[in-house]
Amino acid sequence: MKFFDHALETMPPKAIKELQIEKFHSLFKNIYGQNRFYTEKFDAARIDHKTIQNVNDIAQIPLTNKEELIKAQEEKPPFGSNATFPESAYSRFHQTSGTTGKPLRVLDTPESWEWWGRCGGFVLT
């Protein structure tokens, strides 16, 4: 059997859950207080770094839909309040086609672009 990332893809279930929580806490730390869109969303749901202690707790986080993101972009053009870093940290910009309404604009950092590439690697392996 071929693997794109053998260590990750063969990790025991308990280790996967621990990694998921570790990654969530890292993401939360980077977003909360920096990204106005998600800070307001977490505050409204009373979610903080202590709320999520295991993967089951993630269900408490409110989902985000495209309409919310487009509304944020209309209120604060062109990218809305869903930016975590200064504009200079972003290396790419793309947008959806807008076939279901208005196009959604998305900024990528070099790290997020690399993540998308890794997703492709998992799919193609």
Q: Regions from the language model: what does each represent?
A:
Residues M1-Q95, G101-V123:
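Nucleotide 5′-phosphate-binding alpha/beta core
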